Amino acid sequence: MFPYPSGAGLHVGHVRNFTIVDVLTRFYTQQQMNVLRPFGYDTFGLPAENYAIKTGISPQSATETNIHNFRKQLKRLGYAIDWSREINTSNPDYYRWTQWCFLQLYKKGLAYRKESYQWWCPVDQTVLANEQVENGHCWRCGTEVEKKKMKQWFFKITDYADELLADIDQLDWPDKIKTMQRNWIGRSEGAEIDFEVVDSKDFIKVFTTRPDTIFGATFLVLAPEHPLVSKLVNDDTKQKVDQYRTETLKKSEIERQENKEKTGVFTGSYAINPGTGEKIPIWVSDYVLMGYGEGAIMAVPAHDERDFEFANKFNLPVKQVIEKPEGSTDSDECYHGEGELINSGHFNGTRTEDAREQIVAWLHEQGIGEQKVTYRMRDWLISRQRYWGCPIPIAYDEDGNEYPIPEDQLPVIIPEVEDYKPDNTGRSALAKATDWLTFEMEVEDKKTGKKVKKTLTRETDTLDGYACSSWYLWRYVSPHDDKSAWNQEAISYWAPTDIYVGADHAVAHLLYIRFWCKFFADQGLLPFREPVKTLLYNGYINAPDGKKMSKSKGNVIDPLDVIDQGYGADTLRTYEMFIGPYDMDAAWDPKSVGGVYRFLNRCWNLCFGEERALASDSEGNLATTGASATSSPVTTGRARSVARGTEDKDRLCIRNKTIKKVTDDIHRHNFNTAVSATMEYVNELYKTGAEKEDLVTLAKLLKPFAPHLACEMLEKLDSDDVWPVWDEKYLVADTVELVVQVNGKLRAKITVSVDDLEDQEKIEKLALAEKNVQAFTKDGIKKVIYVKKAKLLNLVA
């Protein structure tokens, strides 16, 4: 429950997510549990800053307006939110503690600064976020962008890579989310090998998962950004390599990894293959990424598809070093499987599975290789050259030395500025706040170690918004605490989070909160190592045509429009739970909304004897509203005063079965079938007439989905809202329905006692007493098939 409060407000797709949480909140509250259901806003980010640049309206002002609109929508939807715990990441009382979290990571060496490439617009003279680059051009001015090296802040999430990966197995999360996190972390075991550069003192470090194939390495490929590239070129190759590097820096990593024709440039230099002692050429190509391993690969085209394609393109040698096993059906030109080594010196004949360890040991003896584990996941880049973000609590002296802001001087407040555009060096608009930018602070001099007063310059980068949302779950337990980020007694009582409902950021936010949880557990500040016990990953509500709702497409449906049309909040909430399994995408269907409205009217009519008229057009839109007096099954003869006996027992069976069904369905998060079971119960009450206890049960079962209607009913019935409990003895009915077939076709359904199921002769007599069965068995019965478990009697005539 931590949305970004956009100017567009909520649409009906958001309502599904929030209603799931509300259904569970009300359900467990009715079961008399203590339920924490707070709400907050993830308010930092580009949209508010871009809006400020465009309109001059400050992000602070625009954010407050948007939050007011969100709050209004949420209250209209009837959510049981504890508004006393409302939080907002751009409130200084909140981001004070985000800055404190940063400093804890900084103290332990897990927040650090290094150079990194960023998108840069040479005309606007500013850094661009990935989403601001459109087909290689600046979204504002259309200029072709380039990559520029800048100092950036990172969190060392890779220090926790092994634990983050290992603990995925214990999570009660959807398999697809766990798989995405495993793949994102991307643990690879292999070897790091040094390749000596010919006529140079340099070595190129290469990571490979297949050290057993080293004798088949016929060339090396470096990422164009590799720091050694500039030293490997010569006068003949420098221009081509520089041009290729420039073109590569315009591409995203996704574009570089797409299956397409390989490109590359020869550097002019060679390396020595430590296995064969042969000279092999060194190339650069964009299919090698700087972030994986060491940004360099040994290419074995006989046994790797991408290397094979590259070798074919540039006529490079292919050397087979694994013999394909006899009977292998692998028809690929390059063999990827296991087998015996060939053309591999004294390792010939060794199985590849054994050779990996033996070859690494051999390389280690020579001092040019060792076992290594690497990860696809990189350290988390957390600095942004934006105004509207949490200021990083770091300052610098004139020599560039870093000084953390003392905790008792937090928060570092975001200053008001007149111009929200970044300055012409790519720094954020914070750099223009000169009164804020420089200040005096007593620090320990880096050279002398003495306490001195220095004039310092504040960091003008701000934190990635994900930093603010990496700890909000713990702030909820004590949102007004001004002594700590979270109260230890409260965190022990309320956390970790039992149920988290969300549909995005599987490998961003959901990974980052796990990282921070483990870090703060190591500091003794959290009594658990995983932040969320159960994750529900809900599907989207799409537009009626199946397309995703978005403001740009003009297909957004405002929940308040649905409510004000006459359907009301209860209809909208119940429809969104009834539309299908919560984890599946669904298309908005106006006609079905009308159906749910009619169902709730039937519930009203059962209790109050008054059903609001509904006339709808072909699209399900309300044509008229109002009320038409109809008789209630409670207040007329339809609510028969039932004599004690079988009919009472049947009523109790139906009621208790419904209670169990709805309870189990909500526990299993099958919200759609819980609503369906309630609908079936209403149908039964219309058939039999409803007694007070039936209506009390109905109102209690309805309350998580349609709280407004349910509360009206419970007040009328003078009842509490405690969740009903079924009685096991009423789950088995005294009577059952038995199907009678003649020659395999349905001819009758008869009601028999459970005891009579044991008496086939009696069952046959009851069946033959049915006129329709008699009509089809005039010529006699040749054979009788009775299946007791299936409650089926088939007469062969």
Task: Give the residues covered by each predicted segment.
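Intrinsic disorder/low-complexity segments
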Residues: S200-K201, G609-K649, C653
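NTP-handling and nucleic-acid-processing catalytic cores
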Residues: V12, T98-V318, E323, P422-F439, ...
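Alpha-helical recognition segments enriched in aromatics with Gly/Pro capping
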Residues: S269-G275, K279-Y292, V321, D435-E440, ...
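N-terminal catalytic cores of NTP/NDP-binding nucleotidyl/phosphoryl-transfer enzymes
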Residues: M1-I57, I87-C101, T208-T209, P274-F310, ...
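Basic, alpha-helical terminal appendages of large translation-related enzymes
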Residues: A223-H226, K238, L316-E333, E357, ...
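Helix-rich, typically C-terminal accessory recognition domains appended to large enzymatic cores
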Residues: D42, K107-K108, Y112-C121, R187, ...
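Residue patterns forming the tRNA-binding/recognition surfaces of aminoacyl-tRNA synthetases
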Residues: I53-P211, P227, A296-Q409, E418-Y420, ...
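Conserved phosphate/anionic-ligand binding catalytic regions in large, soluble enzymes, centered on
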Residues: I204-H226, W380, R386-P393, D461-W474, ...
